[in-house]
């Protein structure tokens, strides 16, 4: 079986139906001995460009493992579901279980109070003559 990353965008008026959609698609995968490695609900987000005169949509990310027949059935159901505005399926080399950058960005957004302060950066250089590592810390200047 192959590994795939699937992102689909749901119409914002159908946001309350997203959990039922996820359940249905998950069952389609697991019924045929497939597996879901990562499932993330990114929620309603601003679209980069309008799709069908809509400016926001509900995003879902799935990393799955399935056979080609299951994938064809899944894509077929995406195409004929009017609530799904767009979908993208990408073949991956292996399973991905770590949080996506979108989820990491939500957790690591800096507070508004700490905008003016900059953390020191650390540069590590290898001194090949002595075989030792040299560590130098630099302060970022944030003068306005």
From Swiss-Prot:
Transmembrane segments: none annotated. GO terms for cellular component: cytosolic small ribosomal subunit. GO terms for biological process: translation. GO terms for molecular function: small ribosomal subunit rRNA binding; structural constituent of ribosome. SUPFAM superfamilies: Ribosomal protein S6. Residues 104-114 have a biased composition (Basic and acidic residues). Coiled coil: none annotated. Residues 95-144 are annotated as: Disordered. Keywords: Ribonucleoprotein, Ribosomal protein, RNA-binding, rRNA-binding. NCBIfam families: S6. Binds together with bS18 to 16S ribosomal RNA. PANTHER family: MITOCHONDRIAL 28S RIBOSOMAL PROTEIN S6, SMALL RIBOSOMAL SUBUNIT PROTEIN BS6M. Belongs to the bacterial ribosomal protein bS6 family. HAMAP family: Ribosomal_bS6 (MF_00360). This is Small ribosomal subunit protein bS6. The gene is rpsF.
């Amino acid at each position: 079986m192959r590994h795939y990353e699937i992102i689909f965008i749901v119409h914002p008026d159908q946001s309350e139906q997203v959990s039922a959609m996820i359940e249905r698609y998950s069952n389609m995968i697991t019924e045929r001995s497939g597996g879901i490695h990562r499932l993330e609900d990114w929620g309603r987000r601003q679209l980069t460009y309008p799709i069908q005169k809509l400016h926001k949509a509900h995003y879902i990310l799935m990393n799955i493992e399935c056979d080609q027949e299951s994938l064809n059935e899944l894509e077929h159901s995406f195409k004929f579901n009017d609530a799904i505005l767009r979908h993208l399926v990408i073949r991956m080399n292996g399973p991905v279980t770590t949080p996506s950058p979108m989820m990491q960005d939500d957790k690591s957004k800096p507070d508004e109070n700490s905008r003016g302060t900059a953390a020191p950066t650390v540069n590590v250089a290898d001194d090949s003559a002595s075989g030792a590592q040299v560590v130098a810390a630099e302060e970022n200047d944030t003068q306005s």
